[in-house]
Regions:
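Hydrophobic residues on short alpha-helical segments
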Residues: 13-20, 47, 65
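Short helix-capping/turn signature of helix-turn-helix
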Residues: 20-23, 70
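Regulatory hinge/linker segments at domain boundaries
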Residues: 1-18
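C-terminal edge and immediately downstream basic/flexible tail or linker adjoining helix-turn-helix-like DNA-binding
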Residues: 56-71
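Recognition helix of helix-turn-helix DNA-binding domains
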Residues: 24-60
Length: 71
C-alpha cells in the first residue's frame, strides 16, 4: 500500500511536521522562515494531496496530522 505522504514535497512534509506539533500557521511561518501566504499555500497543498476536502464535520488539519502520524 502506498504511503499518502509520498505525494508531498519535502517542504510540505516539513510544514505538516510542524502542524503535527500543534503549531499555528503563524508559528509555522516563524519556525520555517516563510511568509503567511506561503504557509497557506503549503497547507492547502497538503490538504489537496492527502485528499482532504472541506466538510462541515471534518477538521482537515487534524486529519492531515493523523495521516502524518500513521505514516
Amino acid at each position: 500500500m502506498r504511503n499518502p505522504l509520498d505525494a508531498l514535497s519535502e517542504r510540505e512534509r516539513e510544514v505538516l511536521a510542524v502542524m503535527a506539533e500543534g503549531r499555528s500557521n503563524q508559528a509555522i511561518c516563524e519556525r520555517l522562515f516563510l511568509s503567511p501566504k506561503t504557509v497557506e499555500a503549503y497547507v492547502h497543498n497538503v490538504f489537496t494531496k492527502l485528499d482532504l476536502h472541506p466538510a462541515p464535520d471534518a477538521n482537515r488539519r487534524v486529519l492531515a496530522v493523523l495521516a502524518y502520524l500513521r505514516a
